[in-house]
Every structure is written in structure tokens, then in C-alpha cells.
Amino acid sequence: QVIAITGSASGIGAA
């Protein structure tokens, strides 16, 4: 599982 910055509420998501 790779952690990447996304446009989610927390700004962090699992890619």
C-alpha cells in the first residue's frame, strides 16, 4: 500500500 497526497478532506490518502 502506497501513501500518497490526494484531494481528500485530510489531504492524505492510500493509493
From Swiss-Prot:
Presence of keyword Cytoplasm: yes
Catalytic activity: a 3alpha-hydroxysteroid + NADP(+) = a 3-oxosteroid + NADPH + H(+); a 3alpha-hydroxysteroid + NAD(+) = a 3-oxosteroid + NADH + H(+)
Record-annotated disulphide pairs: none
An example Gene Ontology CC term for this record: cytoplasm
Key words, A-Z: Cytoplasm, NAD, Oxidoreductase
Superkingdom of origin organism: Bacteria
GO molecular function, one term: androsterone dehydrogenase (B-specific) activity
EC number assigned by the record: 1.1.1.50
Family that this chain belongs to: Belongs to the short-chain dehydrogenases/reductases (SDR) family.
Annotated protein name in UniProt: 3-alpha-hydroxysteroid dehydrogenase/carbonyl reductase
Source organism of the structure: Pseudomonas sp
Organism classification: Bacteria, Pseudomonadati, Pseudomonadota, Gammaproteobacteria, Pseudomonadales
